Regions:
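Divalent metal-coordination and catalytic microenvironments
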Residues: 64, 156, 265, 349
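Sequence context of c-type cytochrome heme-c attachment sites
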Residues: 26-152, 159-254, 328
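Active-site lining segments that contact anionic ligands and/or coordinate catalytic metals
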Residues: 222-225, 257-262, 268, 318, ...
Length: 355
């Protein structure tokens, strides 16, 4: 009995000590209260700069979802050679490095060009997140003189909307040696920046009867690409973040030209079928393209049914003319971007091929 009592007394003592420690704690008396630190930022207010009751961001996302940037599907081209323009991740990486030729590595989980490609989304969490990710002048890769664009905000577009030098190697020189080229030689896509900048930008300016000068679209339109392709939006069909210049009528078949970005200069112009053919520019250019194509086919430099070239060895001047054809055909505006320059290239090229 005495033994049990001793055990009980010992356990009780341990419990009492533990209880005292629980309420008293092991720390000593606290020191003086320190100075109040700076107030933290209001997270709700910061996020609310963009995430608010406005539907502006949502509207632009909807426009983007209808754009070729979103639907083109080319972001599968995530290799080092293609990712710099076909994926968001590749573009940001090459822009940061200053080398737009190749991404540093194969892009895992690639995404198409999106908000984060052209803007600094979620970097400062304020309105500066919507500033263009770059507006620096862009060196044109096919220019032998190191020409750069001066498109202001449109410089962002010029980074990718230009042909790569690798596609026009060997590069033709005036009256140079014969050149051996492969079937896919030449600027086959995205030549807009070269045509828009015009004189001295990398096209083969073979001498001829027509002087090489630029049109007002090249020299006077502010921000170049942005003014026309991002004009006040028409729902999700044209302008704004669709970047589209055409839209379909309610029949789903008839294609209309969207001229909201043109009317500041071309007063009275209205959207509709064939409205870009001001002063018959497109009609004239399409006729000249057809003439030059026929001459290149006759010279066995171009496939008879496609715009794919034919491998072979040809005079340097004629190789340069083939480059002109591919630059203009791939550019897609049928002369609108720079009418005077394009007509000079075509007419002088045609005259030379007829010799």
């Amino acid at each position: 009995m005495q033994k049990v009592s001793a055990i009980f007394t010992g356990v009780l003592a341990i419990v009492m000590v533990a209880g005292v420690a629980m309420f008293v704690g092991c720390q000593r008396d606290q020191g003086a209260i320190g100075l109040t630190g700076p107030a933290g930022s209001d997270g709700v207010a910061k996020c609310g700069t963009c995430h608010n009751v406005s539907t502006e961001v949502l509207a632009k996302q909807i426009q983007w979802s209808a754009s070729v940037h979103a639907t083109g599907g080319h972001f599968r081209s995530n290799s080092t050679a293609c990712a710099s323009c076909h994926t968001n991740e590749g573009f940001r990486a090459t822009m940061d490095s200053g080398n737009m030729v190749a991404a540093p590595a194969l892009i895992d989980n690639p995404t198409p060009p999106n908000c984060r490609t052209c803007h600094n989304i979620h970097q400062k969490y304020d309105l500066t997140d919507f500033v263009n990710s770059t507006t620096k002048p862009v060196k044109l890769m096919v220019s032998s003189t190191g020409a750069t664009t001066n498109f202001d905000k449109g410089n962002l577009c010029a980074n990718c909307h230009q042909p790569r030098l690798s596609k026009v190697t060997p590069y033709p020189t005036l009256n140079g040696d014969d050149l051996t080229i492969v079937a896919n030689w030449g600027a086959q896509m995205a030549s807009q920046a070269v045509i828009l900048r015009g004189v001295g930008s990398g096209a083969f300016e073979i001498p001829g009867s027509v002087a090489y000068i630029n049109s007002s679209h090249s020299t006077l339109v502010p921000n170049r690409c942005i003014t026309c392709h991002m004009a006040p939006v028409r729902g999700d069909t044209a302008g704004g973040h669709t970047w589209k210049m055409t839209y379909l009528s309610s029949d789903g078949i008839t294609e209309n030209n969207y001229v909201a970005g043109c009317v500041a200069c071309h007063t009275g112009l209205t959207s509709g079928v064939g409205k870009f053919d001001v002063n018959k520019v497109q009609t004239d250019v399409e006729g000249l393209i057809a003439q030059l194509k026929a001459l290149l086919v006759t010279a066995k430099m171009l496939d008879t049914t496609t715009d794919r070239g034919l491998a072979g060895t040809f005079p340097s001047n004629k190789v340069g003319i083939l480059m002109n054809y591919k630059l203009i055909e791939a550019e897609g505006s049928h002369g609108v971007h720079n009418p005077l320059f394009v007509k000079a290239l075509l007419k002088n090229s045609i005259d030379y091929m007829k010799k």
